[in-house]
């Protein structure tokens, strides 16, 4: 099964200062009819989450100005329903533990392939859907 099919009904926000990554993912998503919005900085990402709801929020850790962890922390407050993915080129224990503490769903290390990222996103969405269904049954 094509993991892009799992993303067609989901809106994705990508925040990354790397133009190649932004352009590559935007092209990959749009050619598969998967909605994506890209931002170069955390500040642009915050503007995006004020303007629309996202199912998936992906952020690079190293960004100019506010870092990706601080951005995702704010994004989680505004859009707690979103799956949060942190992209990082650095294996840093503090970064990982802080990311888990603030609710980051998954990590992906650079370099990564579009195929690997899309598979991770599809899996994360499925997992979240199952967790919500279990939570809804538990409340009844």
Predicted regions and their residues:
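Acidic, metal-coordinating helix/loop segments flanking the phosphotransfer/catalytic sites
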Residues: 38-56
């Amino acid at each position: 099964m094509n993991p892009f099919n799992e993303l067609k009904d989901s809106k994705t926000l990508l925040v990354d200062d790397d133009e190649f990554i932004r352009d590559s993912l935007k092209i990959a998503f749009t050619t598969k009819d998967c909605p994506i919005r890209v931002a170069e900085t955390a500040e642009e990402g915050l503007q995006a989450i004020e303007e629309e709801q996202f199912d998936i929020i992906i952020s690079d850790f190293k960004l100019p100005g506010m870092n990706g962890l601080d951005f995702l922390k704010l994004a989680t407050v505004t859009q707690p329903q979103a799956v949060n993915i942190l992209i990082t080129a650095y294996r840093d224990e503090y970064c990982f533990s802080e990311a888990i503490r603030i609710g980051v769903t998954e990590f992906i290390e650079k370099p990564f392939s579009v195929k690997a990222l899309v598979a991770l996103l599809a899996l994360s969405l499925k997992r979240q859907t199952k967790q919500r269904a279990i939570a809804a049954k538990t409340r009844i």
